[in-house]
């Protein structure tokens, strides 16, 4: 099985996680209730604004959704908010979207939330598999000389890869996308990478 073959590799990858944390800044509140992250960028003021946005989102969602099985990944880039995770109902999804849109500074909400009946169930095997895929992609981004890895977030849930960040040019975008698409064990890639030139328009 996948897990038997890769568990030793996963352990090795986890040993590298402290190094790879420089790629993505992730903070959690509670026991995995909500994960939030902001992509690191050289523009200090933009980072401050994004940090404020995801902090406000985090606080609002913790206040509204106090059940510990809720697990969302919220990423913010230039006011664009990417929501990733499994939730229990359409009602919860609408509440989450309403809360996020109500935060000052949010200019776009990218909804990658999935309704999953057993979203409160923690599947340890799937978690280890997703973690292995995530770390393997991140390590390749770090080692790719033509990729500015600090500009990308990689999130994997249920074998689906979610990419978020800023590509300096088309070649870098294609290389990042290719690394994710060729990762072993994935079923899909959701690409939400911005082109640097588009930000200047």
Over which residues does each language-model region extend?
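N-terminal targeting leaders
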Residues: 2-8, 14, 20-201
């Amino acid at each position: 099985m996948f897990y038997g073959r890769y568990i030793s590799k996963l352990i090795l990858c986890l040993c590298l996680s402290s190094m790879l944390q420089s790629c993505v800044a992730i903070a959690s509140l509670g026991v995995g209730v909500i994960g939030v992250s902001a992509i690191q960028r050289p523009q200090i003021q933009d980072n401050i604004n994004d940090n404020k946005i995801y902090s406000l989102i985090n606080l609002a969602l913790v206040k509204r959704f106090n059940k510990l099985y809720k697990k969302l990944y919220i990423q913010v880039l230039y006011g664009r908010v990417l929501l990733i995770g499994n939730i229990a109902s359409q009602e919860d999804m609408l509440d989450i979207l309403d809360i996020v849109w109500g935060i000052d500074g949010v200019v776009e909400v990218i909804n990658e939330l999935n309704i999953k009946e057993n979203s409160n169930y923690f599947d340890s095997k799937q978690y280890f598999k997703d973690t292995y895929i995530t770390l393997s992609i991140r390590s390749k981004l770090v080692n790719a000389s033509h990729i500015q890895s600090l500009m990308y977030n990689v999130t994997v849930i249920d074998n689906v890869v979610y990419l978020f960040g800023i590509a300096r040019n088309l070649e870098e975008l294609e290389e990042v996308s290719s690394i994710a698409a060729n990762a072993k064990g994935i079923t899909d890639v959701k690409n939400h990478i911005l082109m640097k030139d588009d930000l200047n328009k």
